[in-house]
From Swiss-Prot:
Lipidation (S-diacylglycerol cysteine): C18
Protein name according to UniProt: Probable endopeptidase NlpC homolog
InterPro entries from the UniProt entry: Murein_DD/LD_carboxypeptidase, NLP_P60_dom, Papain-like_cys_pep_sf
Name of the coding gene: nlpC
GO biological process: peptidoglycan turnover; proteolysis
Organism the protein comes from: Haemophilus influenzae (strain ATCC 51907 / DSM 11121 / KW20 / Rd)
Length: 183
C-alpha cells in the first residue's frame, strides 16, 4: 500500500514539475560580441502545409534583444543541457536550479532552490512591465524562467532542457501565471 502511494505521489510530482512545452526552438551558440537575436531562434521554423513538416527559415540577426553579455554567456554555457528534476549540474538541471545558477552568475543574487520559494521573491509586476532579469512563472507557479526581452525567456524545460522560448507561443501564453521583479 505504501509503495502504491509513493508511486502516485511520484507521478503527481512529475506531472506538475517544470514544463514540457512543444519543441519550437532551435539551439544555437550566441556570440558574446553580438547582440542576441532570439526571435530568430523562436520564429525560424515554418510549417509546410502540404507535408506537415517544419523546416528552417532564414532570419536576420539585427534585433538587439539581449545585449547583456553575461546572460549570453550563461545561455551559451548551458544551452541544450537536459532537464533533470532536482538536477543542478551540466548532466541535468531543473528550472529553479537554472534560475539559481543564472542569477548567481549574472546578477550576483542568491535565489532559493525551489520554484515554490522563488515565486514569492521581490514584487509582483504586470506582464506588460517585464524587463530583462525578471522572473516569469507558469503552470500554477511550478515552472520558472528569466525574461530576456522581446517577449522571450530563458529556462530549463522537460522537453528541451535549457532553451529560449517566447511568451507569445500558445503553450506559454496559456500557462503564464505571474512575473516578479527581484532587482
Amino acid at each position: 500500500m505504501l509503495k502504491r502511494i509513493l508511486v502516485i505521489i511520484g507521478l503527481a510530482v512529475l506531472a506538475t514539475a517544470c514544463s514540457n512545452a512543444p519543441r519550437t526552438v532551435s539551439h544555437q551558440v550566441i556570440s558574446e560580441n553580438d547582440d542576441i537575436q532570439l526571435t530568430g531562434l523562436i520564429n525560424n521554423l515554418e510549417k509546410d502545409n502540404r507535408t506537415g513538416i517544419f523546416h528552417k527559415v532564414r532570419t536576420n540577426r539585427s534585433s538587439a534583444l539581449m545585449g547583456d553579455k553575461a546572460l549570453a554567456s550563461v545561455y551559451n554555457e548551458w544551452v541544450g543541457t537536459r532537464y533533470r528534476m532536482g538536477g543542478t549540474t551540466k548532466r541535468g538541471i531543473d528550472c529553479s536550479a537554472f534560475m539559481q545558477t543564472t542569477f548567481s552568475e549574472v546578477f550576483g543574487i542568491e535565489l532559493p532552490r525551489s520554484t515554490a520559494e522563488q515565486r514569492h521573491l521581490g514584487r509582483k509586476i504586470n506582464k506588460s512591465e517585464l524587463k530583462k532579469g525578471d522572473l516569469v512563472f507558469f503552470r500554477k507557479n511550478n515552472h520558472v524562467g528569466v525574461y530576456i526581452g522581446n517577449n522571450q525567456f530563458m529556462h530549463a524545460s522537460t522537453g528541451q532542457g535549457v532553451t529560449i522560448s517566447s511568451l507569445d507561443e500558445k503553450y506559454w501564453a496559456r500557462t503564464y501565471t505571474q512575473s516578479r521583479r527581484i532587482m
